[in-house]
């Protein structure tokens, strides 16, 4: 409990986002992933979430990832729906990436048109750490993805990518905020949408460079078809 309390709901602020507050209030259990100092996980860890119910259902998922100094790991989170019901899913992921650590985080959604999903990902990076975050939406109803990433130590870098392939009446929003609190950090964002029919997509990316964050490098690209 003391270990979890050190990290849980520290960067996922309940007073800044209503969905995060709702998830924090309603979440009954969650997933804790802890990678100790200098441990390098060679194989990708896959986490599969399957929505299964005989009635309409709301679910609230919570994930806490703690990677200590020099740790390396890759994670693939997959969302699927097994039943033709109305689902409302909220998800909050908090990831702490220690000094010289490396995190690859992939989030894939392939549900159905009755699924409503809001996913908030919060990442905190220490000095010389590396993060590769990829969010992929293939089949859904309405989806809103949010990424808040903050640099706490110099020399860190992140690569944040998104891919959306949607048709019919699918709706997909991606919102990002990269907070350069210290200097000598690099952020790269690339989001691509392929839309057909009545599908709608939106992308809003913000980069905040704090006073004194010298030699910041940031690139943001959004391409659509």
Language-model segment annotations:
Residues 2-225:
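Conserved beta-strand/loop scaffold segments within soluble protein domains that form the structured core
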